[in-house]
């Protein structure tokens, strides 16, 4: 997933709806990132430019709404996505990747509840329990720290890119 995000970000595309339902693992272990209906594309002449083009909704579901409203799945939304900030960038996808990692490590989303308003407030202000301290699970500290870094409320405190997330994981498990 990190590699797919890294490629998308490198060509100026932000997914904006990273969640387990949009991740498919094929029969040979290949990982596919699905449902690009909320993706935002930056013009190719300047990937960091504020001038952006919306990709039309291809698969509108309950978690998605019209322009100017919340777009995405609340359990995996970044604080800046919840606040509908105009200058949202690829770091929002890094947050969502962290939420998916958190769920993979703990079996639970970072924030839960039955009231959407409460979940959104938690996304904005609450720090989830650290995965390595979650129940009796043995989660490697480096993976727990990386996940919590991705879930930082401040986008500047998250890993600098999806490639950095992949690099940290590869460095600690392939060497």
Regions found by a protein language model. Give the residues of each.
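Short hydrophobic/aromatic patches on the structural cores and recognition surfaces of FHA
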Residues: 1, 16, 77
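Protein kinase catalytic-loop region centered on the HRD/HxD motif
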Residues: 2-13
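C-terminal lobe helix-coil module of Hanks-type protein kinase domains
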Residues: 5, 24, 34, 73-175
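Short coil/turn segments at alpha/beta junctions that flank glycine-rich nucleotide-binding fingerprints
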Residues: 10-12, 27, 112
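Catalytic-loop of the protein kinase fold
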Residues: 13-21, 25
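Short, flexible, glycine/charge-rich loop motifs used to bind or transfer phosphoryl groups or to couple energy/partner
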Residues: 22, 65-67, 136
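Activation segment of protein kinases
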Residues: 28-30, 34, 39-79, 114
């Amino acid at each position: 997933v990190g590699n797919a995000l890294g490629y998308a970000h490198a060509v100026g595309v932000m997914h904006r709806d990273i969640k387990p339902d949009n991740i498919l693992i094929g029969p040979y272990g290949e990982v596919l990132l699905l449902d690009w209906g909320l993706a935002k594309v930056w013009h190719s002449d300047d990937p960091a430019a504020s001038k952006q083009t919306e990709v039309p909704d291809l698969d509108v579901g309950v978690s998605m709404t019209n322009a100017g409203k919340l777009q995405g799945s609340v359990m995996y939304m970044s604080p800046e996505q919840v606040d509908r900030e105009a200058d949202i960038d690829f770091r929002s996808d890094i947050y969502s990747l962290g939420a998916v990692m958190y769920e993979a490590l703990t079996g639970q989303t970072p924030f839960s509840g039955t009231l959407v308003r409460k979940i959104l407030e938690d996304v904005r202000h609450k720090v989830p329990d650290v995965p390595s301290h979650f129940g009796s699970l043995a989660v490697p500290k480096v993976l727990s720290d990386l996940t919590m870094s991705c879930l930082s409320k401040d986008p500047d405190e998250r890993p600098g890119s999806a490639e950095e997330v992949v690099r940290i994981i590869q460095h600690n498990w392939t060497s």
